[in-house]
């Protein structure tokens, strides 16, 4: 009998996070799964996507504002280009609707 990991694909992780939200355990789960650097990188990625969707700043300006490399901005931009206008609108609405002060 070969050993296999319990979680093998992205959808299982999405389902795990969804379940943790339903159980009001998402903060604990995400804190335990991600290092401080990974959490910081995720915050940067959310800000990159948000700024790209707003379209008010150049990639260079976003890079300078967030203190990340231009290649990181480009990767975010390339991912957004793969999404439909409808998906981008939904993502923008989601990001806009959850803004909170630190």
From Swiss-Prot:
Gene3D superfamilies from the UniProt entry: TrpR-like
UniProt keyword terms in alphabetical order: Cytoplasm, DNA-binding, Repressor, Transcription, Transcription regulation
Subcellular localization, as worded in the UniProt entry: Cytoplasm
DNA-binding region range list: 59-82
Record-level Gene Ontology MF annotations: DNA-binding transcription factor activity; sequence-specific DNA binding
Family matches, as InterPro entries: Trp_repress (IPR000831), Trp_repress_bac (IPR013335), Trp_repressor/repl_initiator (IPR010921), TrpR-like_sf (IPR038116)
NCBIfam families named among the record's database cross-references: TrpR
Similarity remark: Belongs to the TrpR family.
Name of the featured protein: Trp operon repressor homolog
Species in which this protein is naturally found: Vibrio vulnificus (strain YJ016)
Gene: trpR
């Amino acid at each position: 009998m070969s050993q296999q990991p319990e979680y093998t694909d992205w959808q299982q992780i999405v389902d795990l996070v969804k379940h943790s939200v339903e159980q009001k355990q998402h903060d604990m789960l995400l804190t335990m799964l991600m290092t401080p650097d990974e959490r910081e990188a995720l915050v940067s990625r959310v800000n990159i996507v948000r700024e790209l969707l707003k379209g008010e700043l150049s990639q260079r300006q976003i890079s300078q504002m967030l203190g990340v490399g231009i290649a990181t901005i480009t990767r975010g931009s390339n991912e957004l280009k793969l999404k439909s206008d409808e998906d981008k609108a939904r993502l923008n609405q989601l990001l806009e609707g959850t803004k909170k002060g630190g």
